[in-house]
Amino acid sequence: MPSNPCRPGSDTTAAPAAVFPSAAPNWRRLDYLAQGNERQRSAHALLSGGLWDELGPLCNDLALVSTIAIGLDRPGSDLDILCQHPDPAFLAATLAAQGWQVRSKDEQVWIAEQRRHGPDGQCWPVELYLTPDPLEMCHGWRHLSLMAALLERFGAPFHREVLRLRFDEGLKGEAAMCRLLGLSGDPYEALLTLEGVNLAGLCCPSLPHPLDEQGHRPCPHPGGTLLP
């Protein structure tokens, strides 16, 4: 299969103790990790030190969609990688022959897992999602893009609260953000309701928000109300 044609660029956006691609995030990139926090730099060393080149010829497309990409990972977090291939079962068999632990998630998606040591000695659990779908359509890509946009929208206080919920209560990133935003139901589905929403007008009830001219905090998310 042809290798991933997308090569790293240079555009980065600062985030608390981390960096991630700015507007229209391209999760195929790795370069921004080298400029991030210690764990991001460690992940970059592993991925760019051979794993990306190892997987590239096997897949049509690759993207890192782990929370480490936006600085919301915890110790032990996986490096989640989307791998596009027209025949995921064939790719799974190829990876199994190379020592990966593989299993079927459904008829179209396979999972491959392995622990890898980077050049810095750090051991990372790596999880590959083998899919025939374009990567931008995958929930992992869509969730990460929304979470990055929300971090940019609400800044450091939001980032700190998400991390607090991740560490103190063990919540996934999606669940932590949905709690802070007051989104009910399945957090994986609830987060996707923000696709296409103008986040500039979105409020986070858990964070201070400037009052409008009527003394309310605007909360224009569909179904939301003006909060006194």
Predicted regions and their residues:
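Residue-level signal for secondary-structure boundary sites
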Residues: 89-91, 134-136
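Helical scaffold of the NTase/Pol beta-like nucleotidyltransferase catalytic core
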Residues: 2-64, 222-228
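Catalytic cores of NTP-dependent nucleotidyl/adenyl transfer enzymes across multiple folds
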Residues: 136-228
